[in-house]
Amino acid sequence: MVKRYVVDPIVRMWRAARNARPQYPPQDDWELAKGRFNSIVYANVTHKQTGVSFGVSTYHMPCMFRNPKVMTLHSALAATYTMRESEKDGTKNSILMGDFNVKPIDGSYELLTTNNLDENDVFYPIPYEGTEYIVEPPARMVSCYKEVNGEEPDFTNYAKIKDDEPFIDTLDYIFVTENIRVDAVAPLKHRDEVTDGPYPSENE
């Protein structure tokens, strides 16, 4: 006995569209990393009273959390660039700050703060076959807030898009090389203490 099924016209249209969808090659993390045009800003500053100089950079990382290897490459390059420019200016005092779009549990953060990342980690960028690439920056860096408080802030980003659940986590950091002593940081609120948002307000 032959069974007959009635196929909904919408289902037929969906199947046709799916079959007609263009096939894209697998994404290459290195090409993705090179294709971003985020800019880093560097300056050498000198303390007027002591004459001590610092190399200071700020960077806004790509928001590519679905491509963790791309995030690691940009994090490592930002740290390496900052340290190398500082050294050119005759100082080993480097400061790197900005919106990194990585969380404290991410491999990019681990690489910056330990100068080490397991090659099997999903965040570790694998070089092309037959090539070599040292992803580790010249030295590890210290997160100022964790250095002083023993942990990162509860959050630096509190965002809500339409009907999605709010995203609350730490994405912004101030990193310094180990030779810089961090004495204090500005206090930041816990998410439970924030009742007067969103920021900026109409008056800011």
Predicted regions span which residues?
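Intrinsic disorder
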Residues: 30, 50, 65-72, 165
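Internal, well-ordered alpha-helical segments in soluble enzyme and binding-protein domains
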Residues: 39-41, 74, 78, 108
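Metal-dependent phosphoester-hydrolase catalytic domains
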Residues: 28, 44, 83-95, 101-204
